[in-house]
């Protein structure tokens, strides 16, 4: 597998297709289907959200479906605000990172800062979306992993906090409480609801990442990663 990054400058595209083209990430493999990821932006007033779009897939209908789903999911962060991008005094800057890109999975992380003038403090946003390249659908943690108390215990023992300040955080949760959080993971469709879940998952080449909402003083979100090899008994399919 070869991943090639090419930076493009001064290439503009019509606003109707979401702004300027800034970068190109090309994925090649020895499979029958190659694809490229290109960074696009949603802009409105002081709101900027970057998200990837695919090109070069052999199956154009699947590519169209994926691109529509990716953009829709990227913009769900707007549901945190009562009037979305039209919210008075809103400044929002969200960037995306490709966590995994192969013939089976595309896993995307979004993070950034949102602030409404006059509020006590800005919000550190973090959310993710993972797609099966075989059917173009977004897939949640519980569709890939058997979630039970044994998995919760394994996550507590084997995972590492990405922030040293959050080491030991999972140990402070009972297996039942941690399991309840994991079972609600990846519910992008509930963002903005009263009982929304702030738990998300992502995949890298060798790990599963879990993001859990925490207090603003702790950074609003905390991430933990566990090696895929350590959770093989819980996987519903090889990854």
Regions found by a protein language model. Give the residues of each.
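Compositionally biased intrinsically disordered regions enriched in Thr/Gly
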Residues: 14-239
């Amino acid at each position: 597998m070869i991943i090639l990054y090419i930076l493009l400058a001064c290439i503009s595209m019509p606003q109707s297709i979401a702004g300027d083209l800034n970068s190109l990430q090309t994925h090649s493999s020895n499979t029958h289907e190659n694809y490229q990821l290109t960074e696009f932006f949603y802009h409105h007033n002081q709101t900027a959200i970057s998200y990837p779009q695919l090109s070069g897939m052999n199956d154009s209908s699947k590519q169209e479906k994926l691109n529509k789903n990716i953009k829709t999911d990227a913009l769900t962060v707007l549901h945190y605000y009562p009037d979305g991008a039209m919210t008075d005094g809103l400044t929002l800057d969200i960037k995306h990172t490709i966590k995994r890109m192969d013939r089976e999975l595309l896993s995307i992380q979004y993070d950034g800062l949102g602030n409404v003038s006059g509020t006590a403090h800005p919000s550190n946003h973090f959310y993710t979306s993972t797609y099966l390249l075989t059917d173009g659908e977004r897939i949640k943690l519980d569709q890939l992993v058997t979630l039970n108390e044994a998995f919760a215990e394994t996550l507590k023992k084997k995972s590492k906090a990405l922030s040293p300040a959050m080491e030991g955080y999972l140990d402070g949760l009972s297996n039942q409480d941690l399991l309840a959080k994991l079972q609600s993971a990846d519910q992008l469709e509930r963002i903005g609801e009263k009982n929304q879940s702030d738990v998300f998952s992502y995949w890298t080449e060798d790990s599963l990442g879990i993001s859990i909402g925490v207090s603003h003083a702790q950074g609003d979100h905390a991430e933990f990663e566990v090696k895929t090899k350590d959770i093989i008994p819980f996987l519903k399919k090889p990854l």
